[in-house]
C-alpha cells in the first residue's frame, strides 16, 4: 500500500494528497471549476499506485487510455457515451470489486461497474470520489446494461486468473479484464462478438453502423492474448 505525499497545482493553489485524502487550502481552485482538469492531474500523479478510499476499501489506478462504451442501441440516433477505464476498486476485505470509470465529459462523473449488479454512480467527479465519497456513497444501481470496450466486446471481471501464468484461458462471448496490482497487465479475451473500428476522441460509430456489423459479422473462434497498459506520460493524459 502506497502512502502518497505529493503536491498538485490547480492554477496557483496547491493541493496535498496524503493516502487518498485531497486537501485544498482554497475553494477557488481550478478543480472546482473544471473537474475534468482535476481528474487528469490526479491520474497523472497517482498512476500505478494503490490508495485507500474514504470509508474503507482500496483503489488501484492503472491510468490507461482505454475507453469503454456506455449507451443504448435500441433506437436510431441514441448517443454512445464514452468512459475512461481508471482502475479497480475493492471494498474492505475484497468482498466486492468494481471497475472504476470516468465519463469523458466536462465533469468527469465517476462510475463503478460490478459484474452481476451493473453500473453504479459513485461521485460527481474523480476528486470527490477520492476525497469524500469512496465506495460507500454508491447508489443501488444506475444501469443494468452491459458495458462494452471500444471494439464492442463485453467488459467483465476475471477473478481467478493466475498473475504469473503465460497462457490465458478462454471464456466465450465475453471480454474479461483483470487489473493486476503487481504487473500492471490486463488479461483480455476476445470472443465471437463482432469487432468495430477503434474509437477515437474525434470519431464514434453510429448506431446504424453498429447494427450492420452486428447483423453481418460471422462467428469467430475465441482468441486470447495478454496486453500491457500504456505507461503514463507527462502532460495531459486524455
Curated annotation (Swiss-Prot):
* Similarity comment: Belongs to the varicellovirus ORF2 protein family.
Q: How is it modified after translation?
A: Phosphorylated by host.
Q: What is its main location?
A: host cell
Q: What is this protein called?
A: Membrane protein 2
Q: How does it sit in the membrane?
A: Peripheral membrane protein
| Pfam families reported for this sequence | DUF1314
Q: Key word Membrane present in the record?
A: yes
- Organism the protein comes from: Varicella-zoster virus (strain Dumas) (HHV-3)
What residue intervals traverse the membrane?
none
Q: Name one GO cellular component term.
A: host cell membrane
Q: Where in the cell is it found?
A: Host membrane
This protein's source sits in the domain of life called Viruses
Q: Which UniProt keywords apply?
A: Host membrane, Membrane, Phosphoprotein
Amino acid at each position: 500500500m502506497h502512502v502518497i505525499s505529493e503536491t498538485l497545482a490547480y492554477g496557483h493553489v496547491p493541493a496535498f494528497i496524503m493516502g487518498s485524502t485531497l486537501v485544498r487550502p482554497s475553494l477557488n481552485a481550478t478543480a472546482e471549476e473544471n473537474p475534468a482538469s482535476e481528474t487528469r492531474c490526479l491520474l497523472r500523479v497517482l498512476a500505478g499506485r494503490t490508495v485507500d478510499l474514504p470509508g474503507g476499501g482500496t483503489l488501484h489506478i492503472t491510468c490507461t487510455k482505454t475507453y469503454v462504451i456506455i449507451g443504448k442501441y435500441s433506437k436510431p440516433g441514441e448517443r454512445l457515451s464514452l468512459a475512461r477505464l481508471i482502475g479497480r476498486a475493492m471494498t474492505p476485505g475484497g468482498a466486492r470489486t468494481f471497475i472504476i470509470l470516468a465519463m469523458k465529459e466536462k465533469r468527469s462523473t465517476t462510475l463503478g461497474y460490478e459484474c452481476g449488479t451493473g453500473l453504479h454512480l459513485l461521485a460527481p467527479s474523480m476528486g470527490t470520489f477520492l476525497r469524500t465519497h469512496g465506495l460507500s456513497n454508491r447508489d443501488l444501481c444506475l444501469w443494468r446494461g452491459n458495458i462494452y470496450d471500444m471494439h464492442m466486446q463485453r467488459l467483465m471481471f476475471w477473478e481467478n486468473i493466475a498473475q504469473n501464468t503465460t497462457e490465458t484461458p478462454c471464456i466465450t462471448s465475453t471480454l474479461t479484464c483483470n487489473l493486476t496490482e503487481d504487473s500492471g497487465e490486463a488479461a483480455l479475451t476476445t470472443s465471437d462478438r463482432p469487432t468495430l473500428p477503434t474509437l477515437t476522441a474525434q470519431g464514434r460509430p453510429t448506431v446504424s453502423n453498429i447494427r450492420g456489423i452486428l447483423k453481418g459479422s460471422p462467428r469467430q473462434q475465441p482468441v486470447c492474448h495478454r496486453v500491457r497498459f500504456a505507461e503514463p506520460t507527462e502532460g495531459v493524459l486524455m
